[in-house]
Swiss-Prot record:
Its main location: membrane. The keyword Isomerase does not apply. F-type ATPases have 2 components, F(1) - the catalytic core - and F(0) - the membrane proton channel. F(1) has five subunits: alpha(3), beta(3), gamma(1), delta(1), epsilon(1). F(0) has three main subunits: a(1), b(2) and c(10-14). The alpha and beta chains form an alternating ring which encloses part of the gamma chain. F(1) is attached to F(0) by a central stalk formed by the gamma and epsilon chains, while a peripheral stalk is formed by the delta and b chains. This is ATP synthase subunit delta. It comes from the Bacteria. Keywords: ATP synthesis, Cell inner membrane, Cell membrane, CF(1), Hydrogen ion transport, Ion transport, Membrane, Transport. SUPFAM superfamilies: N-terminal domain of the delta subunit of the F1F0-ATP synthase. One of its GO terms (cellular component) is proton-transporting ATP synthase complex. It comes from Maricaulis maris (strain MCS10). GO terms for molecular function: proton-transporting ATP synthase activity, rotational mechanism. It is found in: Cell inner membrane. F(1)F(0) ATP synthase produces ATP from ADP in the presence of a proton or sodium gradient. F-type ATPases consist of two structural domains, F(1) containing the extramembraneous catalytic core and F(0) containing the membrane proton channel, linked together by a central stalk and a peripheral stalk. During catalysis, ATP synthesis in the catalytic domain of F(1) is coupled via a rotary mechanism of the central stalk subunits to proton translocation. The gene is atpH.
Length: 179
């Protein structure tokens, strides 16, 4: 899903959920979906695959929403996304929705990718450091990406800080090719 499309879907869902008093429930549902997609690459692949019909993807999402007891607005949004060929992009929609909900609460969201899981103490220290830098309350969302090899990538709004070992090695590789 393009950032623009994810923004449109997420904004529409957020406004509807907020007007229905279900913004937090939908946010929790979408966070659960993101976790499912991360934990089950097979699910993510099935939703993104052009080999599966729209109806199959809609059925998968409907069953998932029912089993997880998701809010009806979340389930309906899954159906709309599937019918419009966007089932594979629900992770992006969930990410944008979370940012909208956090902004509505006056909290800035920091997406942090690390090679290994951060401890609670490390996450709290990072949040405090980011709060000091941005002057606002920070909500840290972490994602483990072993391919980074070490270090971390922090994305806050349109700003990104990449201190991963992978990017440093890629930079060295490029410099060596140019030499």
């Amino acid at each position: 899903m393009t950032a623009e499309a994810a923004g449109r879907y997420a904004t529409a869902l957020f406004e509807l959920a907020k007007s229905e008093g279900a913004a937090e429930a939908v946010e929790a549902d979408l966070a659960a979906l993101r976790a499912m997609l991360t934990e089950s690459p097979e699910l993510a692949d099935a939703l993104a695959s052009p080999l599966h019909a729209v109806e199959v993807k809609a059925g998968i999402l409907s069953a998932l929403a029912k089993k997880a007891k998701f809010n009806v607005l979340t389930a309906n949004a899954f159906g709309v996304a599937a019918r419009n060929g966007r089932a594979g992009d629900l992770g992006d929609l969930a990410r944008v929705y979370a940012a909208l909900a956090a902004a509505d609460r006056g909290v800035v969201t920091a997406d942090v990718q690390t090679a290994a899981a951060l401890t609670k103490k490390q996450t709290e220290a990072l949040a405090a450091s980011l709060k000091s830098a941005f002057g606002r309350e920070i909500e840290v969302r972490t994602e483990v990406r072993p391919e980074l090899m070490g270090g971390l990538i922090v994305k806050v709004g349109s700003r990104m800080f990449d201190s991963s070992l992978r990017s440093k090695l890629d930079g060295m590789k490029t410099a060596m090719k140019e030499a």
